[in-house]
UniProtKB/Swiss-Prot annotation:
SUPFAM superfamilies: FdhE-like (SSF144020). One of its GO terms (molecular function) is ferric iron binding. InterPro entries: FdhE-like_sf, FdhE_C, FdhE_central, FdhE_N, Formate_DH_accessory. Keywords: Cytoplasm. It is found in: Cytoplasm. Necessary for formate dehydrogenase activity. One of its GO terms (biological process) is protein maturation. It holds the Pfam family FdhE_central. NCBIfam families: FdhE, PRK03564.1. It comes from the Bacteria. Belongs to the FdhE family. This is Protein FdhE homolog. HAMAP family: FdeH.
Amino acid sequence: MSIRILPENEIKQAASSFQNPPLLFANPKNLYFRRAKRLRQLAENNPFGDYLEFAANLSEVQLDLLENHPIANYAEKLTACIEESNGQKPLNAKTFKRSSEWRELLLLLTEKFKPYANDTMLATIELLEKSSTSELEALADDLLNERYEAVGADKAVFLWAALSLYWTQLAQQLPRNTQTEVGERHTCPVCDSAPIVSVVHFGDTQGLRYLHCSLCESEWNMVRSQCSVCDQSGKLDYWSIDSVDAPVKAESCGDCESYLKVLYQEKDPHVEPVADDLGTLFLDAEMEQKGFARSGLNPFLFQVE
């Protein structure tokens, strides 16, 4: 899938036809605030409550840095980047040339997180702080290219938090008159990263399914009742632990034997991709027992072999 900048006449035409937006950009301030709040809510009476609190604290640090240490303005450069690449995932995490700002965000993030960290986390933070520029860039390359075992789950969470904060702000600077083109929809059309979950919206986009990016936090539309990995639709099943009306379900595909969680805003308007994914880890355990492999990537849950 690619994105392109719409000319003014097409913008007016799309608006007049009530066209469903194929690409939604995040509101970072609201996103981090809602995420932290939801994580704390789900942490109550959850056996993984301590980890949800950890994720909430880190999300609040991200919000702090967003408000007080924003990245530079690259809007003109990014617009040119879309045109030069013909809209082919302009912020592709595997090829986009990062500035040093992500490393600055990492150091600020780890410093601000120290009051919440236990001894194990402090040891990880110390390793990151002592790493050279080349070592940090190598870790980022491994992480963004899905070589998680080369990074380690302990370091990956902090690295991804900084990288995601950087990429989310970059995505905010893309022209708003952009639209996705028809094509491969398995990964984010902005940065080529995997989704965390899919979300079935309510409100203006009632009933539409969007996949939520694990890196730049953008969302892109994908039709329902179609596997987000292999595009097949003949062997899809939906699973939940509590009830058939649960706000979080797992969509499994018998063709490729993968699954991705689905959040239903109509069932619970407060569902949030990262938080509700972490809050339903027992559902992951059930799906793995049934022989399905997780296709979503949660930035607080890196699977390292």
